[in-house]
Design a protein with these regions (language model features):
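Nucleotide-activated chemistry modules centered on ATP-dependent adenylation/adenylyltransferase
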Residues: 1-52, 68, 74, 78-84, ...
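Catalytic nucleophile loop
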Residues: 61-62
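Class I SAM-dependent methyltransferase core
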Residues: 53-57
Length: 288
């Protein structure tokens, strides 16, 4: 089994108010974000014991990841999780990319109505200690993939708290790690943070440095700036940030008791961990 992050540099402990992230420093001086992503792809390829399956949602993060593996010259397959007509507004970007690049994706079909009504969504949320209702269906899809599963679960996120820029991690998003571990899924949910060098290279990217020095008026986080960072290396179309649940949320399915049950999990599993940008950079910089 692959470690969820390289050399287990990123681990967590506790739950809720006691939830914490523990980090190990870089083992070499980071190069650019792009170069470190290429290196991480090579590490995963060399370490994997089964074919690499890249989970492609249609979002910027997963498209950047797929491009990285292409540039690295690594063999891989692509998997797309489908909720039928409910998430085509999101997956259309993945389908279009695959068509343009001659990729035949693996389609993981999920009957989202049955997934909710049957209570499967609650079962998985409890097993993964996940308090975000949009996530268990993705976890369910991952469990159906045969191979080494690679996800791109967001960039190293930095947020502006009244002028104080902080690196932030949430327990609900990191519940993917619980699912991979509990189900014995090989791979990583966090390709864009797989090594400490990726994390530090992103945090010290010139665009992020401008952000944290308040040189970009009106910007509140790295969410919008990452398109600019990713687009230095690849041509990526602008798109909204989707969860894939936007159409489902307009239906009566949301009246199902499952959602109140999952919401109650926030009392236990909704931890947040923050470090100032300065501290996180110091903490994971290579030891002298």
């Amino acid at each position: 089994m692959l470690p969820l992050t390289h050399n287990e540099y990123f681990t967590t402990s506790g739950h809720g108010a006691s939830w914490k992230v523990h980090l190990k420093p870089c083992t070499q001086v980071p190069k650019s974000f792009y170069e470190e992503c290429i290196r991480a792809a090579q590490i995963l390829y060399e370490s994997a014991s089964s074919p690499l399956i890249l989970l492609f949602s249609g979002g910027l993060d997963s498209e950047y990841m797929v491009n990285i593996f292409k540039d690295a010259g690594i063999d891989f397959k692509v998997a797309i999780i489908s909720y039928g007509d409910y998430n085509t507004h999101d997956t259309i970007y993945a389908y279009n990319y695959c068509e343009a690049n001659g990729i035949v994706p693996i389609i993981i079909d999920i009957d989202i109505e049955h997934f909710i009504i049957s209570g499967k969504i609650i079962e998985i949320a409890n097993a993964a200690k996940c308090c975000a209702y949009q996530i268990p269906s993705i976890m369910y899809g991952i469990s159906k993939i045969d191979g080494t599963v690679i996800m791109a679960n967001g960039e190293p996120y930095v947020k502006n708290f009244d002028g104080d820029w902080r690196w932030e991690e949430t327990e609900r998003v990191n519940s993917y790690m619980n699912w991979f571990t509990s189900q014995g899924i090989d791979g990583t949910p966090d390709f864009l943070r797989y090594t400490p060098e990726i994390t530090l290279s992103f945090l010290k990217d010139p665009r992020v440095v401008q952000l944290v020095n308040n040189k970009l008026s009106g910007k509140l986080s790295t969410r919008t700036s990452k398109h600019m960072i990713y687009s230095r290396d690849f041509e990526l179309a602008q798109r909204p940030k989707f969860t894939g649940w936007e159409q489902i949320e307009k239906t009566s399915l949301m009246n199902n008791e499952a959602f109140s049950v999952i919401n109650d999990l926030k009392k236990q599993y909704n931890g947040v961990f923050e470090l100032s940008w300065t501290k996180i950079c110091q903490h994971i910089s290579i030891e002298s």
